[in-house]
Amino acid sequence: MTSKSVNSFGAHDTLKVGEKSYQIYRLDAVPNTAKLPYSLKVLAENLLRNEDGSNITKDHIEAIANWDPKAEPSIEIQYTPARVVMQDFTGVPCIVDLATMREAIADLGGNPDKVNPLAPADLVIDHSVIADLFGRADAFERNVEIEYQRNGERYQFLRWGQGAFDDFKVVPPGTGIVHQVNIEYLASVVMTRDGVAYPDTCVGTDSHTTMVNGLGVLGWGVGGIEAEAAMLGQPVSMLIPRVVGFRLTGEIQPGVTATDVVLTVTEMLRQHGVVGKFVEFYGEGVAEVPLANRATLGNMSPEFGSTAAIFPIDEETIKYLRFTGRTPEQVALVEAYAKAQGMWHDPKHEPEFSEYLELNLSDVVPSIAGPKRPQDRIALAQAKSTFREQIYHYVGNGSPDSPHDPHSKLDEVVEETFPASDPGQLTFANDDVATDETVHSAAAHADGRVSNPVRVKSDELGEFVLDHGAVVIAAITSCTNTSNPEVMLGAALLARNAVEKGLTSKPWVKTTIAPGSQVVNDYYDRSGLWPYLEKLGFYLVGYGCTTCIGNSGPLPEEISKAVNDNDLSVTAVLSGNRNFEGRINPDVKMNYLASPPLVIAYALAGTMDFDFQTQPLGQDKDGKNVFLRDIWPSQQDVSDTIAAAINQEMFTRNYADVFKGDDRWRNLPTPSGNTFEWDPNSTYVRKPPYFEGMTAKPEPVGNISGARVLALLGDSVTTDHISPAGAIKPGTPAARYLDEHGVDRKDYNSFGSRRGNHEVMIRGTFANIRLRNQLLDDVSGGYTRDFTQPGGPQAFIYDAAQNYAAQHIPLVVFGGKEYGSGSSRDWAAKGTLLLGVRAVIAESFERIHRSNLIGMGVIPLQFPEGKSASSLGLDGTEVFDITGIDVLNDGKTPKTVCVQATKGDGATIEFDAVVRIDTPGEADYYRNGGILQYVLRNILKSG
């Protein structure tokens, strides 16, 4: 998106590339920009081009040009992303909101067609496919069929959206994973619009949007509310960050993969601490890192904790763009633009960074990470001994939540990251587990291994013994690795070598392969390696996120029963980016991240209790032991196969009709028209009530009087506590709603898949089974006290909220430190508003959730420094009056407001709460009742 800049620095110029001329905004017109890191040059150009004299001023541009690398971030800027990418879980509610805005505009006498993305938006349907079937030739076809049966209603809605909105396109199911499609096709690196050339930048409704950083495209994950606003032309508010320079030297050694490098970098950056910072790779070693490896590193930025992890543009970028079928004209523009703007990587020029780290790639060794955090790297040589130490925490009463493992908390599922790719099934760490460390369910063998062998008989799989540590899932999955031909063909060559030596996968291993792009299928075909993968059980199950986000599908019944009946701690090995406990499969406690070749190696081994150095994987036909080193492909073999099997034509052919879809997609009955015909019986897509009763001009904001406390919460309440993504529990308000609408229990699906239906989502707000509402003693889950009833009895939070609404009683929520940490799940703010909550008062807020609350018209207030609900003597039974909010009507933002709590006996407690509306823009959003109302009124004003 481009706009007419005020051009304070006279930066507007022309760039000629071949026969074409483009308008650009030259960075060298602004003093001091040459010393900036690449990532900040991208931000500086963004401000220069979008300077409007109010939101973005000359002072903002000078602030970034004169950036002090050592200072703590304090200067807020308005960043305007060039485009938006989405996946279907988070994208559906965005399009629901846009459809609702169209109707609201029409109701207010405006033109509904004015509600259109101003920044191009692409949605890739990749989060819904589940690996239900596996290990058979028709697995892909059947899984897609089941996917359409489950999600047809949502897909019809997205097809309508594609036709109704300009600049909004949908990549249909069974095509690929959003981030891989982004690097292979959607990303242009330099964009052009209205004759202006500028850096490609994006925000996405998924944390791993950062994969595109590998191409030199600045992008990261945001919440749905921010993504919608960005689509409608609103800038993203951010602080100019600290930038960590990560110098790469040396070369990767034989036998080491890009996965090993990224797990090593994850461990280093987690230990260093990069939350809220940009990471930028630089140095002479950058040229040695292939683009696919760069994308793998960028992808795991959320696991590092950083906002972005970017590589600058260089010859390798150009080579990749050419290789993936970008036009010669586009490739020439990228090179010319990068060189003209000082954005071309010069290994001899060292920019200024806030902090410095270095990795010699020759020091990296084969590695895995687990059993429950991506940063917990284990050298493959130590994998068996480490597993034997870890297993004690997972059997009997030796639990991962026991005192010697302080890390396992629910918060970890989304710890310090941008919005997560939501898992299909989540099980949560129990805060109440016994701490007796005696192992009751296992016999400790003489060699130190914890063991509980269980004999399993299966008509289909035969007879075998399962024990703790058995690998029951081996999944080549996730855009993190399936975008990388080196590891994907490395895995296939390892499979070939294994089959030729007579090795087979163990019968209890669920083996799946789900690439992020159809190009992988092509090069497996062309190289003739598919049959070897299939011989080991690795059949194609889908093109989508599958196991990486918890859509691993059920384990075979006999295996699941043996695991649960005998409390076995079994394992999954996957080539994904997250391995939090309970994320991959409800039956699996221990999850390990590994490269695709190692996924196959563990399928052959069948257990984590295995030392590849000393233990053979089996015997060849001559009875000779076969070790992993005997079947590991040489670097030459991998390179030769890549050269012979992959070409540009594969990319151009696969992406020629990327938006077309298969017959199922094309034959979906799809409504037409510029406004959506809502189905009153739908349980997936419903019109939300955000704009009901909205007027063309905002009503004055009011103080809050007579409020009751809906929830009194402690520290580190995450957005997953507030709005869970996983399974819907029978008997809860959300389940009751689905029951009443004729939905069978087996078809409840997850909260994540039902985000287009506010009725389900309101009932799921504050409904996490691990939530502790301190209004109640020793109760966890979505419960509160309902003070509309005599004695304030226990009730579901949703039911109590309905009773309060019926009596026009406003609500407040109290929180501790780090309220709203974790994923920037927009439904955590939407659900809070729709329950009738007017204010959240906490000791501190996570940045994105705080801004999301304002974006929904809920005021975030902070206790005075050092104070909390308990230190002030509040127990949540009081009635609250909050005054001073109405000062906002005078165009000012109050620093504090007065909170008065009246106890049952008439005694009062007063304190001044800090108003956490931090910018003038946020004040405008709050005055309008939210960011979408603000945008909608601006559209109305513009005629």
UniProtKB/Swiss-Prot annotation:
Subunit structure: Monomer.
Pathway listed: Carbohydrate metabolism; tricarboxylic acid cycle; isocitrate from oxaloacetate: step 2/2; Organic acid metabolism; propanoate degradation
Classification lineage: Bacteria, Bacillati, Actinomycetota, Actinomycetes, Mycobacteriales
Protein name: Aconitate hydratase A
Top enzyme class: lyase
pH dependence: Optimum pH is 8. It retains a high specific activity over a broad pH range.
Cofactor comment: Binds 1 [4Fe-4S] cluster per subunit.
Taxonomy, superkingdom: Bacteria
Family to which this protein belongs: Belongs to the aconitase/IPM isomerase family.
PROSITE patterns: ACONITASE_1 (PS00450), ACONITASE_2 (PS01244)
Keyword Transferase among UniProt keywords: no
Gene: acn
Function: Involved in the catabolism of short chain fatty acids (SCFA) via the tricarboxylic acid (TCA)(acetyl degradation route) and probably via the 2-methylcitrate cycle I (propionate degradation route). Catalyzes the reversible isomerization of citrate to isocitrate via cis-aconitate. The apo form of AcnA functions as a RNA-binding regulatory protein which binds to selected IRE-like sequences present within the UTRs (untranslated regions) of 3' trxC and 5' IdeR mRNA. Could catalyze the hydration of 2-methyl-cis-aconitate to yield (2R,3S)-2-methylisocitrate.
Stretch forming the signal peptide: none
GO cellular component terms, A-Z: cytosol; extracellular region; peptidoglycan-based cell wall; plasma membrane
Keyword line: Iron, Iron-sulfur, Lyase, Metal-binding, RNA-binding, Tricarboxylic acid cycle
GO biological processes: propionate metabolic process, methylcitrate cycle; response to iron ion; tricarboxylic acid cycle
UniProt xrefs under Gene3D superfamilies: 6.10.190.10, Aconitase, domain 3, Aconitase, domain 4
Amino acids binding [4Fe-4S] cluster: C479, C545, C548
Organism of this sequence: Mycobacterium tuberculosis (strain ATCC 25618 / H37Rv)
